[in-house]
């Protein structure tokens, strides 16, 4: 289906562009959200007659979005969630969770403006795009942790999961002499051997 774009649409085009899209995308998204018109002769004439006003309205919305976007500059939110020892969440973080977290800080964004390819399912720092207008967006850091203390460490750049695994591995390290024969006492332990033998003889 051919449509006339009424605003910039990512990966499609700019205001006034006539583009070909799948019928379902046009009917379910572009047309009901007034982002485009069917590209018939009547609509082309209507668009050209109102083009200046359409572009002015878009510029006004873009300006408002730029103002709102200032509150998102270098913005981060923290979400405390239960998770396994491997960092997998018991559940997930959705767009709604991010909207609510921003609202608690006095920042209102539409759920549709949270660009989340898939739900967040692990602890850590995640970058999420917030779209306020077709031409205005910001990136927000979402700090997902199991406790406020863990969130603070992550905000300082600490890889909590990596440190946890390092501690676990350190707990299982043993003294190892690559030159020792099977059954041979390591050199550093030989001083203790006579005492052990004496005890056995006694």
Curated annotation (Swiss-Prot):
One GO BP annotation of this record: translation
Gene3D superfamilies (UniProt xref): Ribosomal protein L9, C-terminal domain, Ribosomal protein L9, N-terminal domain
Keywords assigned: Ribonucleoprotein, Ribosomal protein, RNA-binding, rRNA-binding
Ranges annotated as biased composition (Low complexity): 192-202
Family: Belongs to the bacterial ribosomal protein bL9 family.
Function: Binds to the 23S rRNA.
Protein name per Swiss-Prot or TrEMBL: Large ribosomal subunit protein bL9
Organism field: Rhizorhabdus wittichii (strain DSM 6014 / CCUG 31198 / JCM 15750 / NBRC 105917 / EY 4224 / RW1)
């Amino acid at each position: 289906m051919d449509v006339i774009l009424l605003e910039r649409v990512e990966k499609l085009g700019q205001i006034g562009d006539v583009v070909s899209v799948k019928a379902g995308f046009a009917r379910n998204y572009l047309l009901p959200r007034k982002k485009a018109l069917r590209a018939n002769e009547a609509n082309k004439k209507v668009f050209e007659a109102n083009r200046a006003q359409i572009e002015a309205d878009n510029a006004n919305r873009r300006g408002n979005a730029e103002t709102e976007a200032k509150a998102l500059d270098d913005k981060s939110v923290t979400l405390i969630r239960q998770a396994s020892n491997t960092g997998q969440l018991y559940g997930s973080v959705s767009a709604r969770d991010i909207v609510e977290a921003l609202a608690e800080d006095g920042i209102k964004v539409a759920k549709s403006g949270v660009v989340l390819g898939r739900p967040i399912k692990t602890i850590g720092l995640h970058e999420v795009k917030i779209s306020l207008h077709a031409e205005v967006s910001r990136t927000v850091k979402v700090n997902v942790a199991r406790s406020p203390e863990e969130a603070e460490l992550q905000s300082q750049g600490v890889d909590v999961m990596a440190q946890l695994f390092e501690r676990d591995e350190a707990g299982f390290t043993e003294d190892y002499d690559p030159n020792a024969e099977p059954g041979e006492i390591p050199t550093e332990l030989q001083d203790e051997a006579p005492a052990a033998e004496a005890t056995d003889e006694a």
